[in-house]
């Protein structure tokens, strides 16, 4: 008898077959259970200490998972889910994780006890996905993007589950205002639908300033910089400034390579210094030729240049971030110039109404405000402490993402678990028409969809068993808009209760959840390399 050949490294752990699948499903469930209490308006907060000793207080699914350190590969893939959801649509991160975990949990018995091949389960899940998206489409309704009241209600539904609910009115205004500001009309698409570009990441800047009250926050029709003018004598208040944006240093240009100069006479030395000064003077004269009243550069400004520009009646800001400079260009209509020699009259921005420097707390901030038709903006957030501001910032990002999604595809689904319940009831009906073993995993998706309304009831402290059967009965009669009031844990009609969510978010969360479940079911071998213990 030949000795067994060991080809795997002994220090590696390896799980195969059923064992691997069970371990994956357990890990996915564990992640889902951590997040489960963070769904709905009565959500709990999680308090996390990151390795640096910083504190994170949040109930945003994505923010929590980002901070948790996970070892299991399946759990890591769950974290990726919430990230995808966050980048794609910005909201619904918690829903995705709970759904994916629940679908896997519902499929587990068929996989382990009934020994159904994973591929058959996956086929059924894919079929369920197509049908589920169909149902979501049926229960959704179009929305008028220009109707501010309706839009605010919508954003409120997204914010309602977050920490900022105390100031939800204010936050809705901020988010809607900001998104409307950066909305850029690109004409019409091929199908003749309106086409917008809304880039929140690049053109909406959130400046968090501790102190003051949250209600003091506002959207600036312009840009706010944490800078002061470079010279104390420069004007700190300019109405209708003429803005010049530069991407070059205003100091003496040194050659790229090293140069040696031999000096014979003493006057030559003075001449060299003079040339340096003349060069700086020439640069400043070229700038002042277009009569600017505000010069902003991404690089440094030498003392001499400050002196000349001050004499020319010009305020200067230096070392501004590239991203900020782009925003200033969008709001003032100026063009960023890389060489002073190339400055033209058309590069000067005149759309800004007011430049002023204010002291907030103990720092100076420069405002470029009251711009005409700005295509970028800054949200100035005030609040008690840094932790509160960070949480408000996260929630505001979600709210803006919601507003953006609706503008890009104006269609709404009922919230409060109503959409999920409708999908669940419809899938359960269809499962009865399927033949063979496929109907079990198909039914599993239907059962899994119920976990969203169930979790909402549990988080609000209601009785899940009684309420769920009532809800199921309502949906079976065709009331698709019936869902859970997450505050009181009662059954309400979403039309009168007024909680609607963008259809994109619902579709994306179902897609992501089912596809990730399929992915994890396909795995039948996990090899984790263990580092050699020192």
Curated annotation (Swiss-Prot):
Species per Swiss-Prot/TrEMBL record: Saccharomyces cerevisiae (strain ATCC 204508 / S288c) (Baker's yeast)
Subunit structure: Heterooligomeric complex of about 850 to 900 kDa that forms two stacked rings, 12 to 16 nm in diameter.
Family statement drawn from the similarity comment of this UniProt entry: Belongs to the TCP-1 chaperonin family.
Cellular localization per UniProt: Cytoplasm
GO BP of this protein: chaperone mediated protein folding independent of cofactor; protein folding
GO function terms (MF aspect): ATP binding; ATP hydrolysis activity; ATP-dependent protein folding chaperone; unfolded protein binding
Residue numbers bearing the Phosphoserine modification: 257
Role noted for this protein: Molecular chaperone; assists the folding of proteins upon ATP hydrolysis. Known to play a role, in vitro, in the folding of actin and tubulin. In yeast may play a role in mitotic spindle formation.
Keywords from the UniProt entry: Acetylation, ATP-binding, Chaperone, Cytoplasm, Disulfide bond, Nucleotide-binding, Phosphoprotein
Positions where N-acetylmethionine occurs in the chain: 1
Pfam families assigned to the protein according to its UniProt record, in alphabetical order: Cpn60_TCP1
Record keyword Transmembrane helix present: no
One Gene Ontology CC term in the entry: chaperonin-containing T-complex
Family matches, as PROSITE patterns: TCP1_1, TCP1_2, TCP1_3
Major location category of this protein: cytoplasm
Disulfide bonds: 371-377
Protein name per the record: T-complex protein 1 subunit gamma
């Amino acid at each position: 008898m030949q000795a067994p050949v060991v080809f795997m490294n002994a220090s590696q752990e390896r799980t195969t077959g059923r064992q691997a699948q069970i371990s994956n499903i357990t890990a996915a469930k564990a992640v889902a259970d951590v997040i489960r209490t963070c769904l709905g308006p009565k959500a709990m907060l999680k308090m996390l200490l990151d390795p640096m000793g910083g504190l994170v207080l949040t109930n945003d699914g994505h923010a929590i998972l980002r901070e948790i350190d996970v070892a299991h590969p399946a759990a890591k893939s769950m974290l990726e889910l919430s990230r995808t959801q966050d980048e794609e649509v910005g909201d619904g991160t918690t829903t995705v994780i709970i759904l994916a975990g629940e679908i896997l949990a519902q499929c587990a018995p068929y996989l382990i006890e009934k020994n159904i091949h994973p591929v058959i389960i996956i086929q059924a899940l894919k079929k369920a996905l197509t049908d589920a998206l169909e149902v979501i489409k049926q229960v959704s309704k179009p929305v008028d993007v220009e109707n501010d009241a309706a839009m605010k209600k919508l954003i409120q539904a997204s914010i309602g589950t977050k920490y900022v609910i105390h100031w939800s009115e204010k936050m809705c205004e901020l988010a809607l205002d900001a998104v409307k500001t950066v909305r850029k009309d690109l004409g019409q698409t091929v199908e003749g639908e309106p086409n917008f570009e809304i880039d929140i990441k690049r053109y909406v800047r959130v400046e968090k300033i501790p102190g003051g009250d949250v209600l003091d926050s506002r959207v600036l029709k312009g840009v706010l910089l944490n800078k002061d003018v470079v010279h104390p004598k420069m004007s700190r208040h300019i109405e209708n400034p003429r803005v010049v944006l530069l991407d070059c240093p205003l100091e003496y240009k040194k050659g790229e390579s090293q140069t040696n100069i031999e000096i014979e006479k003493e006057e030559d030395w003075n001449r060299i210094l003079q040339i340096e000064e003349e060069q700086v003077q020439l640069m400043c004269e070229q700038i002042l030729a277009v009569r600017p009243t505000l010069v902003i550069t991404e690089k440094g400004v030498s003392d001499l240049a400050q002196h000349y520009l001050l004499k020319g009646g010009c305020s200067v800001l230096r070392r501004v971030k590239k991203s900020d400079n782009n925003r200033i260009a969008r709001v003032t209509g100026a063009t960023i110039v890389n060489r002073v020699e190339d400055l033209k009259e058309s590069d000067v921005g005149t759309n800004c109404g007011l430049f002023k420097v204010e002291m907030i707390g103990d720092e100076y901030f420069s405002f470029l405000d009251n711009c005409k038709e700005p295509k970028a903006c800054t949200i100035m957030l005030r609040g008690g402490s840094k932790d509160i501001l960070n949480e408000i910032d996260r929630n505001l990002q979600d709210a803006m993402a919601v507003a953006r999604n609706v503008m890009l595809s104006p269609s709404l689904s009922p919230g409060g678990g109503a959409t999920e319940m409708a999908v669940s009831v419809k899938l359960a009906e269809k499962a009865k028409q399927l033949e063979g073993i496929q109907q079990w995993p198909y039914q599993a998706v239907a059962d899994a969809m119920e976990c969203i309304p169930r979790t909402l009831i549990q988080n609000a402290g209601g009785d899940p068993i009684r309420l769920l059967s009532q809800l199921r009965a309502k949906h079976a009669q065709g009331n698709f808009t019936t869902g859970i009031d997450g505050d009181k844990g009662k059954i309400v009609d979403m039309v009168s209760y007024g909680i609607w969510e963008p259809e994109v978010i619902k579709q994306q969360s179902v897609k992501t959840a089912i596809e990730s479940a399929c992915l994890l079911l396909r795995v039948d071998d996990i090899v984790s390399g263990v580092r050699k213990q020192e």
